[in-house]
Amino acid sequence: AIFLIMKEKRTYVREPVKINIPSMIPPVVANAALTSGFFHELNFVDDVDWMGDSYVLHQFKDFKVVDSAQKLQKGQFRKECNPEDLMVFSFYPTKPLGGSDGGMIVTDDYEKYKWYKEAVLNGMSYAENNWDRGISFPGYKMYMSSIQARILLNNFKTFDKKMRVLKQLSDTYNKEFGYENTSQHLYRIEVLDNKKFINKMKQLGIVCGIHYPALHLNDVYNKNWKWDCPKSEVLQNRTVSLPMNEKLSFLELEYIIDKVKENI
């Protein structure tokens, strides 16, 4: 979805520009920006506070792009965006509303909506009869499959309950570990050495993760540039994500909390 957003902008802005993104971010965001052909350069910033919330991915002259990231709430677009803006939602399997990957672009701008609707369907205009569709421009085969849609529709049925359970889980973690985390996708804490901590937890049967390594230090993106991201450089070795699953039983949660406390 992020890739497609930049492709749409590229159709009428010919000069590529620089994009500012947090260094601690999933590589998919950086990759989408670069491969879209719109942005020729990444500028990594030392923003470590965006996690758990949506954030402005890019501010164009006439509208902004918001990545909902780990957040999904009723009426979110109207609360955070103007009609001409774009908001991206991810259906990654472990996100609040998970599917079999893919995502969604939301806008109240009809011209943008029309372009995306055609772009994801091979650049073809819409018609009730498939054979009456015309080719507007070279597009992409990026529309949601029936299987993806079915999985999402089924997950919608239990979405409210899932959010309530995840909030209770986050609140319990906050109480036990002294944090004020609000994300219902990732629960991150700091340890002295996240790799050692993760290996120890794995031995105890607890799977944790790192969200995320600092991309500005990765050779793929670092073309001899030096970015001032001291917080990201520290946190990439200290941040760790605890299990965040609505299926966790009380005994499993109690076990996780006890073992984390023993090893931090």
Where are these regions (language model features)?
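Generic structural signal for small/hydrophobic residues in well-ordered secondary structure
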Residues: A1, I19, G37, D67, ...
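Short, conserved alpha-helix that lines the donor NDP-sugar binding/gating region
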Residues: I2-K7, S170
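PLP-dependent aminotransferase-like
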Residues: K7-S68, L72-G75
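Conserved PLP cofactor-binding pocket of PLP-dependent enzymes
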Residues: Q70, S125-W131, K196-D228, V234-V240
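Active-site region of PLP-dependent enzymes
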Residues: L72-F77, P83-E190
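Short amphipathic alpha-helices in soluble, non-transmembrane regions
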Residues: Y116, F197-G205, I256-K261
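Short beta-strand segments
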Residues: I151, Q184-V191, G209-P213, S241-P243
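PLP-dependent enzyme catalytic core of the Aspartate aminotransferase-like
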Residues: K223-I264
